Structures are given as structure tokens and as C-alpha cells.
Amino acid sequence: MYTNIMVAVDGSASSRQALDEGLKMARLHRARLFAVFVVDKSILLSYAGRLDPNALIEEVRHDGVAVLRDAERTIAHAGVNGDTEIVETELGQDVAERLQHYVAEHAIDLAVLGTHGRRGIRRAMLGSVAERFLRTSICPVLLVRGDDATRAAVAAA
């Protein structure tokens, strides 16, 4: 049923769980998995004048390389055919839009995202990204709640 599966990764526990679920789906459907890390330039450029935006972008790219190395090891260990890629937002584009563009570029037929990403300047906020992505998605979406979200929901019940 699925041939190309995209998983958005940012190094958070939620995105690692999304990768695990994406790998299960890829094995089940013998699909190719694409792990994607997005550098959100728009958030980083808002610090211009106080911090060097180019240095911040390079730092996020460096983080992306580390996150994707881990994803590559996980994909290889699972025995799934997969690729990893760092992509960057364009001026005026948010992370959800960039992921939608990636979906169209790579004929993705299932997108997998964690519901809670890393917070702060060194990450692209996947929690709100997941919601925006879901609203505009051109393909089926699997949202994966992280352990922290599950624990909080159970504690609140």
C-alpha cells in the first residue's frame, strides 16, 4: 500500500518514536523510508542583531547531521531501505510547508511525525508543526505521541 514513507526527525524522544513507527510501516509495506531534518531559518533569523544568524543556522545544521547519523544507524539496524536528508525552509516558509514540499518532491504516500518536538532555538518545533502539517497534508499522516505525552495524559486522567 505505501511505497515512500517520510519521517520528520529532530532528535526528540517523540521523533525517535515516530521513526520507530515509520520503520514498522516500512517493513510491513516493504517501503522506502525518508528521515528528514528541517532547518527552520525563519526562527533563527529572528535573532538577527543579537546573535549571528549564520552561526546559529550552522549550529542547527550540525545538530541535524548528528540526528540523521542516529537515524541512519536505526534504519540500517532495522534492515529497511532508507535515506536521510537535511532540508531548509525558504524565506516566509514554515517547517510544515517545507515538509509538504518534500512530500510532493519525493512522492511520499505516508508521513510520520511526532506530536512533541524539541523546544527552543536549537530545534524546529514539531509539536505545532505536526498540527499545521496535518491540516494541509496531501498524503495520509501518522502522528505518534511521545512517552512524555502519554505519561501526562495518564496522570491527568
Which stretches of residues belong to each language-model region?
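Residue-level recognition of beta-strand->loop/alpha-helix junctions
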Residues: F37, I86-E88, R145
